[in-house]
């Protein structure tokens, strides 16, 4: 397979995932066959303290600083779950993103599906415990993470071409908003529905085909 130029692929993990997720390890191994491609799986939560305090705006700005620090160009993004929200807003705010492959993306801030009573309790106590899968334990999150998230309640237009792969049985991030988003921005967004729940790890081979054909424009 041939690639016409050097490229950068950034993987943005989900809210309670990490840069060492199943997807990150899978793509890192697959992309070893493409020396023209720089692969970066950014870890937004290197420690529980980072997870406790980091906001959506903070993650977007952290991604910007990472891109500048590493002088990255020809960027495409794989955004998984919450990473999809970060990808869309980063591209909209800063530009420089050629394509986005979004995997069961959160297109808006979802407040984890908490009830009004649960949100009120979170505000009252100032922090609430959330299970972080990568750390394997509950970690408190400050309420101002929720306050910041309220800035991201409406979907934004895509700044570059997007393919969304989403499971029809996803209960964590339901597929219906992705259907609406793809219909609203049909010129830029293509939705691929699969029989899967949220993590999509049973469909990594399919996702990899779109990494090659869509993000890399690989010629066979």
List each language-model region with its residue ranges.
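Short, surface-exposed "cap/lid" segments of acyl-processing enzymes
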Residues: 2-45
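Glycine-rich phosphate-binding loop signature in dinucleotide/nucleotide-binding domains
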Residues: 3-4, 69-73, 157-158, 218
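Aromatic pocket-lining residues of Rossmann-like dinucleotide-binding sites
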Residues: 90-94
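The alpha/beta-hydrolase serine catalytic core
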Residues: 98-220
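Alpha/beta-hydrolase active-site loop signature
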Residues: 16, 43-48, 107, 198
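Short, surface-exposed alpha-helical segments at coil->helix boundaries
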Residues: 21-25, 57, 175-179
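Alpha/beta-hydrolase active-site loop
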Residues: 51-69
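Gly/Ala-rich beta-loop-alpha elbow adjacent to hydrolase catalytic centers
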Residues: 78-87
């Amino acid at each position: 397979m041939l690639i016409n130029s050097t490229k950068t692929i950034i993987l943005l993990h989900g809210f309670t995932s990490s840069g060492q997720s199943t997807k990150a390890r899978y793509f890192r191994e697959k992309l070893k066959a493409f020396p023209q491609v720089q692969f970066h799986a950014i870890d937004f939560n290197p420690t529980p303290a980072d997870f406790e305090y980091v906001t959506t705006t903070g993650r977007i700005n952290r991604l910007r600083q990472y891109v500048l620090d590493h002088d990255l160009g020809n960027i495409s993004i794989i955004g998984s779950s919450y990473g999809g929200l970060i990808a869309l807003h980063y591209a909209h705010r800063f530009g420089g993103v050629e394509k986005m492959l979004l995997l069961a993306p959160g297109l808006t801030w979802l407040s984890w599906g908490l009830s009004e009573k649960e949100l009120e309790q979170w505000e009252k106590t100032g922090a609430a415990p959330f299970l972080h899968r990568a750390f394997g334990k509950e970690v408190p999150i400050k309420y101002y993470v929720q306050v910041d998230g309220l800035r991201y309640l409406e979907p934004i237009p895509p700044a570059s071409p997007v393919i969304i792969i989403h499971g029809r049985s996803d209960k964590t991030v339901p597929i219906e908003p992705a259907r609406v988003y793809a219909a609203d921005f049909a010129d830029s967004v293509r939705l691929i529905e699969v029989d899967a729940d949220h993590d999509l790890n049973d469909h990594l081979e399919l996702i990899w085909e779109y990494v090659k054909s869509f993000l890399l424009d690989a010629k066979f």
